[in-house]
Amino acid sequence: MKMINKLIVPVTASALLLGACGASATDSKENTLISSKAGDVTVADTMKKIGKDQIANASFTEMLNKILADKYKNKVNDKKIDEQIEKMQKQYGGKDKFEKALQQQGLTADKYKENLRTAAYHKELLSDKIKISDSEIKEDSKKASHILIKVKSKKSDKEGLDDKEAKQKAEEIQKEVSKDPSKFGEIAKKESMDTGSAKKDGELGYVLKGQTDKDFEKALFKLKDGEVSDVVKSSFGYHIIKADKPTDFNSEKQSLKEKLVDQKVQKNPKLLTDAYKDLLKEYDVDFKDRDIKSVVEDKILNPEKLKQGGAQGGQSGMSQ
């Protein structure tokens, strides 16, 4: 989830302080955390040191996670989460290497799994609040393949060609493809300078509107399924684009929907903050500390503040 990490940070011990705070922290004995002959350390001292913003964020996170777990625990499949973890382990070359990589980020395997579960709860929440139809998914996505001839940004670049040479080569390839479109994949594997997609016959999978270069997108979404474009120039170089038939649409539909939801939230963070506010109301959330309430309302649940902060990565702590 792209927008989630801005609000959902790892819960620290500071969240536990709130249980002792009550309406406001004082220097009374019952609010003393540590005592000594040199003096006591109180809840108020610690809150002042840590900062109310961090405490508010941590406490809000803890509360939100409890609510999400209560509401969506029956909708999140642990088997799918385990499959995600197994996939990551393979990418890292085995379980031991994966867990070592987690440790370098201050995570345990259990914490990583917990983060994946929380991210899944958020997906369920946003799916409840933001409705996207099949027709909208089809309108905003297109399955594509391409052949790319890169243009050097400077003469010293090792990859790519000069603009004139790149354009000429792309035009030659386009003519070759036009003669026999069924050989597109074979030609892409041989000629494309996008090595990642070239290995897969030029396949890019599903491209969403707003996800890539504007000129590439414009050309792609004009094509009918199975059609091949003329040479298209983008910020990456020159492309020959093919609109692939979406034969696997049904199996990819849920993933595409989640990506479109992410896009909507990034463009309009109010969708996320409104979803949180609805949860607080549904679960009768009552802030016992005025300062915490103020930070949550003015910063965490303020869509403008969230927008200024920008979209961040998901909660798992590692790329998937």
Swiss-Prot record:
Residues 139-245 form the PpiC domain. It catalyses: [protein]-peptidylproline (omega=180) = [protein]-peptidylproline (omega=0). Residues 159-198 are annotated as: Disordered. GO terms for cellular component: plasma membrane. GO terms for molecular function: peptidyl-prolyl cis-trans isomerase activity. Keywords: Cell membrane, Isomerase, Lipoprotein, Membrane, Palmitate, Rotamase, Signal. PROSITE patterns: PPIC_PPIASE_2 (PS50198), PROKAR_LIPOPROTEIN (PS51257). The keyword Membrane applies. InterPro entries: Foldase_PrsA, PPIase_dom_sf, PPIase_PpiC, PrsA_foldase, Trigger_fact/SurA_dom_sf. This is Foldase protein PrsA.
